């Protein structure tokens, strides 16, 4: 069992030849008693749900509120035009993140990674990485297990709840988990994966949770797209050998401190931020009435 990223990295290197996925399987057994085959079966089911949510999210219909829907399809058409400014892999991840969260807004089945509101980042980064790196099914499962290992520390030492720590705790955590797993999938070390976490979280510190009308749609859907994009940039920075001056566990502790300091208006209550702009209030009234 590990209680910090430092311990995770050390145990993975010392006992599992750098294989964080195997460390996570052992940790899952320690925590739940689930055997290896059961862990892989359950993770395989998660993988199926993630891939399906990406595909189903390309549907152009609107959510019941009318706030979201169709943007993933728009971005898909734009990518196919060949006129994009951004790299294909990163932009595809952004598209897939929007797709998953639009699917969620339409009451579709998603895999909370780590929450429903931030469910787009990890599937988006993984599916884009599958295309870029040609990941086998085993490598895809390893990706998810590794993400879970890093996410476990973030959840225990900071928060993955927007109501507790703002959006930095939801999309921030999702993006950080994705970045770490991406580094490993690309052949990087557990330490480099930890640095990718640093880069993401430092960029996300202070991000508030301010859902318009209290629904997990605006600005949540597009924030997932940005979180997926950050994961790729952070992973590349880490793979290049760039290191954070602040240790990763101190960065995570800081996320907890910042989240705890946020006023309740900025923690999923829809009482501040974009939710209380004139347009945000108008949209809420149109959906729910006076």
Positions of predicted regions on the chain:
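Generic N-terminal targeting/processing segments that precede catalytic cores or assembly contacts
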Residues: 1-108, 130-132, 241, 248-290
């Amino acid at each position: 069992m590990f209680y910090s990223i430092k311990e995770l990295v050390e145990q993975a290197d010392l006992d599992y030849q750098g294989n964080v996925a195997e460390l996570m399987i052992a940790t899952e057994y320690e925590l739940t008693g689930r055997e290896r085959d059961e862990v892989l079966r359950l993770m395989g089911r998660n993988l199926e749900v993630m891939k399906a949510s990406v595909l189903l999210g390309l549907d152009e219909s609107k959510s019941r509120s009318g706030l979201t829907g169709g943007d993933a399809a728009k971005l898909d058409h734009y990518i196919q035009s060949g006129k994009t400014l951004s790299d294909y892999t990163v932009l595809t991840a952004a598209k897939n993140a929007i797709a998953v969260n639009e699917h969620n807004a339409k009451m579709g089945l998603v895999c909370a990674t780590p929450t429903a509101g931030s469910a787009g980042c990890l599937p988006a980064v993984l599916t884009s990485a599958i295309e870029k790196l040609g990941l086998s099914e085993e490598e895809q499962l390893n990706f998810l297990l590794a993400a879970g290992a890093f996410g476990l520390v973030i959840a225990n030492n900071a928060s993955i709840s927007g109501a507790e720590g703002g959006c930095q705790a939801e999309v921030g955590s999702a993006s950080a988990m994705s970045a770490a797993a991406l580094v490993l999938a690309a052949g990087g070390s557990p330490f480099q994966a930890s640095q990718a976490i640093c880069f993401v979280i430092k960029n996300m510190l202070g991000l508030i949770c301010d859902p318009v009308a209290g629904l997990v749609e605006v600005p949540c859907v597009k924030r997932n797209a940005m979180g997926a994009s950050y994961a790729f940039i952070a992973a590349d920075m880490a793979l290049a050998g760039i290191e954070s001056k602040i240790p990763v566990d101190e960065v995570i502790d800081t996320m907890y401190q910042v989240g705890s300091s946020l006023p309740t208006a900025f923690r999923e209550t829809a009482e501040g931020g974009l939710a209380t702009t004139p347009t945000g209030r108008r949209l809420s009234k149109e959906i729910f009435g006076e």
